[in-house]
Amino acid sequence: MRAPRPAVFLDRDDTLCRNDDLPPDAFPGKHGDLFLPGWVELLPGVADACRSLKAAGYALVIVTSQAGVARGACTIRDVEATHDALRALLPADPDHPGGPSLIDAAYSSIQHPTESVRGHLAIDHPWRKPLPGMLLAAARELNLDLSRSWLVGDKERDVGAGIAAGLDPARCLRVGPPRPGARPADEPDLAAAAVRIVRDTGGGEQTEVTIVRPASTASLTARLGRPLADPHTRRTVEAAARAIAERTGVALLSLELDERSVRAVLANPKPMAAWGV
């Protein structure tokens, strides 16, 4: 089995792409809930920063809060489409746009405990920052070494998620302008953070860019009742899911079932849309 590799976990909005200073037209819902692909614009220096981190041997994993889904402003399909637009702006080979991206995977927390209009998303989910769920899932699914990993984000809750996941606090960097009540940023932007990461650690163990297919998580939760309460039913659903994955060529990394929900991790760029979540 391949040895675990280090990662740089990246917040999305105002770390990789513009958000806070976008015009009102960019946000049909709440300001900050970016789910229109046409408004995705990289911040200065981001492409070169991602390329240098990738060349140094780091997996690049987006961990982002997208509660617009819970608030009813958009769907997981919209979030995935926005991620696709971001991936397209970060090609592994600039001479061949449309090919593999520098981004290995994108994880999104779509729940909100108090603002959700969708009952099944009105929870304080372990993927919500500053909880570490997204990072821990990525480490498990992508075979990542958290002890050698970094996190870069623009908010304290980003940093908190990294620390809660067990990352060295010195490797959890806040970037961006000063924020009221927050400590000073560690670096002005991702470009500066990337220079620091490569300088301080000498990068990972790889010397070439490694491209993997993004892993995504699809969750289906019953609104009423416990349709999977019967163990036989759960076994039948699990067998059917694995058979469908095998027939369609989708790599099913893991499958978890309980009495009300199914959670599948797929090595597929856009599984959420395929599952109709």
Language model features with spans:
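Active-site neighborhood of HAD-like aspartate-dependent phosphohydrolases
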Residues: 1-61
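Short, solvent-exposed loop/turn segments at secondary-structure junctions
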Residues: 68-73, 159, 265
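Hydrophobic beta-strand scaffold residues
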Residues: 60, 169-172, 252
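Short catalytic/metal-binding and nucleic-acid-binding patches
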Residues: 206-277
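Short beta-strand segments at enzyme active-site cores
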Residues: 59-65, 104-109, 255, 264
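Asp-based, Mg2+/Mn2+-dependent phosphohydrolase catalytic module
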Residues: 2-4, 8, 77-80, 84-104, ...
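A short, N-terminal amphipathic alpha-helix
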Residues: 43-57, 85-95, 245-246
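Short, basic/glycine-rich phosphate-binding loops at helix/coil junctions
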Residues: 20-30, 61, 107-120, 214-223
